[in-house]
């Protein structure tokens, strides 16, 4: 499972870990990512989404159905 949000398409990014001596080493910034089950009322079924915290806020703000339609329109999510 790749760590990419299915709603917002957020993914990890790379950068530098900077020490006090200004010595830089490469590191990875991970997304606040988890998998969560949602009950989709329109389809009358449970779905499991891999989402970030920002994706969860989007679902809370505009609703599950609108968020899924928006993500599938952008090509982030494929619905059967």
Curated annotation (Swiss-Prot):
Q: State a single Gene Ontology molecular function.
A: structural constituent of ribosome
For the biological process aspect of GO, one term held by this record is: translation
Which Gene3D superfamilies does the entry mention?
A: Ribosomal protein L28/L24 (2.30.170.40)
- Keywords in alphabetical order: Ribonucleoprotein, Ribosomal protein
Report residue spans for region: Disordered: 1-21
Which superkingdom does the taxonomy of this entry point to? Bacteria
* GO CC terms in record: ribonucleoprotein complex; ribosome
Membrane-spanning residues where? Answer: none
**Pfam family example for this protein?**
Ribosomal_L28
Q: Can you list the disulfide-bonded cysteine pairs?
A: none
Q: Which family does it belong to?
A: Belongs to the bacterial ribosomal protein bL28 family.
NCBIfam families per UniProt: L28
Protein name per UniProt: Large ribosomal subunit protein bL28
Which species? Answer: Azobacteroides pseudotrichonymphae genomovar. CFP2
């Amino acid at each position: 499972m790749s760590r990419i949000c299915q709603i917002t398409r957020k993914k990890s990014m790379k950068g530098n870990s900077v020490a006090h001596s200004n010595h830089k080493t490469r590191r990875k910034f991970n997304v606040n990512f988890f998998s969560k089950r949602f009950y989709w009322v329109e389809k009358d079924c449970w779905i499991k989404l891999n989402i970030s915290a920002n994706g969860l806020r989007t679902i809370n703000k505009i609703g599950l159905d609108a968020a899924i339609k928006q993500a599938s329109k952008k090509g982030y999510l494929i619905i059967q």
